[in-house]
């Protein structure tokens, strides 16, 4: 009896481990996000268990939102692969995502826009 717990659980089958992501019903890894939150805070501070679940849920929701809009953009252009251009069109086309994501997307191109003052009136012709 060197281990101390030899006869305690001998008859019971061990329960299968359930990850925190599965408990929360998420696809994003709650454990990994919790680890990164702990190491990235000042002086390796304390992070509550629910903070990682909440952060994972937010990241999963935002990712699903961007991918849905980018998928719609690629479908409109009749292609089956999402490119950085489709991500750019999706993010800049949505007002809330545009204000949230200020990053430059490599290979995203530019958003077509002509200022109203530059558009001439119908019937008005420039004479040279």
Curated annotation (Swiss-Prot):
Belongs to the histone H2A family. GO terms for biological process: chromatin organization; heterochromatin formation. It comes from Homo sapiens. SUPFAM superfamilies: Histone-fold (SSF47113). It is found in: Nucleus; Chromosome. Pfam families: Histone, Histone_H2A_C. Residues 1-23 are annotated as: Disordered. Variant histone H2A which replaces conventional H2A in a subset of nucleosomes. Nucleosomes wrap and compact DNA into chromatin, limiting DNA accessibility to the cellular machineries which require DNA as a template. Histones thereby play a central role in transcription regulation, DNA repair, DNA replication and chromosomal stability. DNA accessibility is regulated via a complex set of post-translational modifications of histones, also called histone code, and nucleosome remodeling. May be involved in the formation of constitutive heterochromatin. The modification N6-lactoyllysine is found at residues 12, 14, 116. Keywords: Acetylation, Chromosome, DNA-binding, Nucleosome core, Nucleus, Ubl conjugation. The modification N6-acetyllysine is found at residues 5, 8, 12. One of its GO terms (cellular component) is nucleus. It comes from the Eukaryota. One of its GO terms (molecular function) is protein heterodimerization activity. Residues 1-12 have a biased composition (Basic and acidic residues). This is Histone H2A.V. Monoubiquitination of Lys-122 gives a specific tag for epigenetic transcriptional repression.
């Amino acid at each position: 009896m060197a281990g101390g717990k030899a006869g305690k659980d001998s008859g019971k089958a061990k329960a299968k481990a359930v990850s925190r992501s599965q408990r929360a019903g998420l696809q994003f890894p709650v454990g990994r996000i919790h680890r990164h939150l702990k190491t990235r805070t000042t002086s390796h501070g304390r992070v509550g268990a629910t903070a990682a679940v909440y952060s994972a849920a937010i990241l999963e929701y935002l990712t699903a939102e961007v991918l849905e809009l980018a998928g719609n953009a690629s479908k409109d252009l009749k292609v089956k692969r999402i490119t950085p251009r489709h991500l750019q069109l999706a993010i800049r086309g949505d007002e809330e995502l545009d204000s949230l994501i200020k990053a430059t997307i490599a290979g995203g191109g530019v958003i077509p826009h002509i200022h109203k003052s530059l558009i001439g009136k119908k019937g008005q012709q420039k004479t040279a």
